[in-house]
């Protein structure tokens, strides 16, 4: 996810700080109300620190932590199992009128090979590289986001490439989107480098196993599968996606930039502009736009969050077919900026960072000059000491 913008820190230690995450999905409002723009977002990912936060009831009147009878308003808090449970509920609600896509999703979330792929991709990216979450939680969150985007596009009359090519209908589109989104990062278990191509190879047997019973016609099955594989291969813009389906997967991937994701990497030692800027993003909202079908709004608690918008999310809008369909906005929350970093001091070979929330982080200082010298010496075939 998010290309090489997710770098790692070294030797960091984090103390203190609980957090909570909220995902809310709601049905689009009927046309004619405020020019067809809904009062409530299609999907909101909201994160706040401290104790569980009371959420305001939406237009449906649902209280925090409840689900309306149609299953379209959900809110979740960490721990991880609860987050996945509620994301699953949101995805199933979005797919309830698309039987083939829903069947594919149910098969995927219970597939032992897929579960293992998510866990190992997360192990490599978080434990070995110090990156943000790329496992099961990321798959479910981005899956919910991708369906919200897809529904808004189809509601606006947009015909995706899968439909325009005559390969399939809306049910096939939702199937391709949910499978492509949830499998897009599994290649990280082999290595971050080339993870897109690795993901294609690893996804193939899973897709064939899931799609076989749903598409008895191999000719159509292979065609639908091509859109999924293309989305996996291009989700990190290397290469950039050529289809709307690929663009949806890439943009949905880019929306998972809230501090809930950044703090995980932070706690495991990745302390840099990437993880710190992620702590500055409180909320990502996906809703119907005014000038375009989709509006993605980012609410920041600190202006440092603009790095996440500029380096992670915006390129996935600009460099994909989604640039024609998505508005992107970012703003500081109404109550003003939050202090993320209050002081940095050097103690021995570590920077000690005092965070605004009272947490303390120790980061090993990298000897950049020595690393450069060693690299040059190695290239010349001599040791740094002999020169």
Per-range role (PLM):
Residues 2-13, 39-107, 131, 144-171, ...:
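Divalent metal-dependent phosphate-bond-processing catalytic cores, especially two-metal-ion Mg2+/Mn2+ enzymes
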Residues 10-45:
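N-terminal intrinsically disordered, low-complexity tails
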Residues 112-124, 172-180:
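Active-site-adjacent bridging/hinge elements
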Residues 209-222, 239:
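Inter-helical turn/loop segments and adjacent helix faces that build the functional surface
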Residues 142, 167-203, 227-235:
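His-Asp-centered metal-binding catalytic motifs of divalent-metal-dependent phosphohydrolases/nucleases
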Residues 116-145, 162-164, 185-188:
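Active-site flanking loop/helix segments enriched in acidic
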């Amino acid at each position: 996810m998010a290309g090489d913008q997710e770098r790692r820190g070294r030797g960091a230690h984090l103390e203190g700080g609980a957090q909570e995450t909220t995902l809310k999905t709601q049905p689009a409002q009927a046309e004619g109300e405020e020019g067809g723009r809904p009062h409530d977002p299609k999907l909101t990912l909201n994160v706040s620190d401290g104790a569980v936060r009371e959420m305001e009831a939406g237009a449906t009147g649902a209280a925090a932590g409840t689900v309306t009878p149609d299953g379209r308003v959900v809110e979740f808090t960490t721990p991880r199992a609860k987050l996945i449970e509620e994301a699953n509920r949101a995805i199933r609600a979005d797919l309830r009128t698309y039987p083939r896509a829903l069947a594919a999703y149910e098969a995927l979330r219970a597939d032992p090979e897929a579960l293992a792929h998510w866990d190992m991709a997360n192990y490599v990216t978080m434990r070995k590289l110090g990156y943000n979450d790329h496992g099961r939680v990321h798959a479910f969150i981005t899956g919910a986001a991708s369906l919200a985007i897809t529904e808004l596009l189809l509601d606006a009359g947009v015909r995706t490439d899968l439909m325009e090519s005559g390969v399939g209908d809306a049910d096939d589109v939702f199937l391709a989107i949910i499978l492509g989104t949830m499998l897009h990062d599994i290649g990280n278990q082999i290595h971050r480098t080339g993870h897109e191509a690795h993901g294609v190879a690893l996804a193939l047997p899973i897709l064939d196993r899931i799609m076989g019973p749903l598409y008895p016609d191999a000719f159509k099955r292979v065609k639908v599968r091509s859109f999924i594989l293309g989305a996996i291969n291009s989700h990190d813009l290397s290469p950039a996606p050529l289809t709307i389906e690929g663009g949806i997967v890439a943009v949905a991937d880019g929306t998972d930039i809230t501090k809930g994701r950044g703090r995980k990497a932070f706690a495991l030692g990745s302390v840099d502009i990437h993880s710190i800027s992620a702590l500055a993003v409180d909320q990502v909202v996906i809703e119907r736009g005014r000038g375009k079908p989709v509006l993605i709004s980012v609410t920041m608690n600190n202006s440092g969050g603009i790095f996440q918008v500029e380096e992670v999310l915006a390129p996935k809008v600009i460099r994909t077919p989604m640039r024609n369909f998505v508005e992107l906005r970012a703003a500081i929350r109404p109550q003003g900026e939050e202090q993320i970093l209050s002081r940095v001091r050097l103690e021995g070979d570590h920077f000690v960072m005092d965070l605004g929330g009272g947490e303390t982080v120790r980061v090993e200082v990298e000897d950049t000059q020595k690393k450069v010298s060693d690299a040059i010496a190695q290239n010349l075939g001599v040791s740094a000491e002999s020169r």
